[in-house]
């Protein structure tokens, strides 16, 4: 058997728009591993955001925080954090302009006081206030709100922050924020589509999915020719460049589709299962 290493993004790839993992995807991953293939999560989410309903599927390892955190068989093998003084400067900047943000670390997820309100405001923009659509617009983020709440009273270790996500608006656009911090950090725009086009992430320079995938392949001593990846966002372009065969979801960005070798169906239409069957992984 030609053993494969398969890297799978989470949001919009493994999960449906409401954050659920289809039973077909669960079955496909478990069956592929039973057949001897190696399956890794490769996500922008930090460790606390990878919730139990995802972990219980069973994976051989995790690339988290967009490449800043790597776990192999439940063992931490790589972790890159932002400088503490820079984290504090960024927070002060966001407070000054009332920009919602959350710090992503292995210890927890720490949101600004206005974080949930700003997220809801972005998600409900353009919807008639009081309508059913308005009231239910952010239902898929309730798990995320609960996660933020669960760390609300925990002390923050500012030296253990993987990356910072922010939710801004046209009043203080992404490009303005990027111009302020892009000399020291890598800036990613709109990594969560529902947060709006002015939202983004601030990450350590040199940390991305390309280098993380490369690290894992080297660690496992497996060639690039045996690797595959599934994704849907622009931050998956680096992941596709690092593997032999990149497969984009139907809902993927146009830029990702341009570098993909194949397009599969959306998660809710059994995209992973269909592709796994096509590549005889089951």
Residues of each region from the PLM?
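Mg2+-dependent phosphoryl-transfer enzymes with acidic/Ser/Thr/Gly-rich catalytic loops
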Residues: 1-5, 21-22, 199-282
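Active-site phosphate-binding/coordination module
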Residues: 17-129
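Hydrophobic packing residues within well-ordered alpha-helices of enzyme cores
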Residues: 25, 50-54, 177, 256, ...
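A generic structural signal for well-ordered alpha-helical segments
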Residues: 32, 94, 178-181, 256
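Short, structured coil segments at secondary-structure junctions
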Residues: 57-58, 66, 181-183, 242-243, ...
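Short hydrophobic/aromatic-enriched beta-strand-loop microsegments
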Residues: 59-67, 186-190, 246-251, 264-266
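Conserved acidic, metal-coordinating active-site core of Asp-based
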Residues: 108-228
């Amino acid at each position: 058997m030609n053993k494969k290493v398969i890297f799978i993004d989470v949001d919009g790839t493994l999960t449906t728009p409401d954050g659920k993992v289809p039973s077909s995807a669960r079955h496909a991953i478990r069956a592929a591993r039973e057949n001897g293939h190696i399956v890794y999560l490769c996500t922008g989410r930090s460790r606390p955001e990878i919730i139990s309903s995802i972990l219980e599927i069973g994976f051989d390892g995790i690339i988290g925080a967009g490449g800043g955190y790597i776990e192999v068989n439940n063992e931490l093998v790589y972790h890159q954090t932002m400088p503490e003084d820079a984290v504090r400067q960024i927070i002060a900047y966001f407070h000054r302009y009332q920009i919602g943000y959350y710090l992503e670390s292995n210890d927890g997820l720490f949101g600004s006081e206005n974080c949930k309100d700003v997220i809801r405001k972005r998600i409900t923009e353009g919807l008639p206030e009081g309508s059913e659509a308005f009231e239910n617009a952010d239902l898929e983020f309730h798990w995320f709100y609960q996660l933020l709440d669960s760390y609300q009273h925990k002390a923050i270790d500012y030296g253990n922050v993987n990356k910072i996500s922010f939710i801004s608006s046209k009043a203080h656009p992404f490009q303005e924020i990027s111009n302020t911090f892009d000399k020291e950090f890598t800036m990613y725009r709109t990594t969560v589509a529902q947060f709006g086009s002015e939202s983004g992430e601030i990450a350590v320079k040199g940390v991305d999915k390309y280098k993380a995938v490369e690290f894992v392949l080297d660690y496992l001593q497996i060639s690039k020719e045996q690797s595959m990846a599934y994704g849907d966002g622009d931050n998956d372009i680096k992941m596709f460049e690092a593997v032999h065969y990149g497969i984009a979801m139907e809902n993927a960005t146009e830029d990702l589709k341009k570098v993909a070798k194949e397009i599969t169906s959306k998660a809710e239409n059994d995209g992973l299962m269909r592709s796994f069957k096509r590549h005889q992984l089951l």
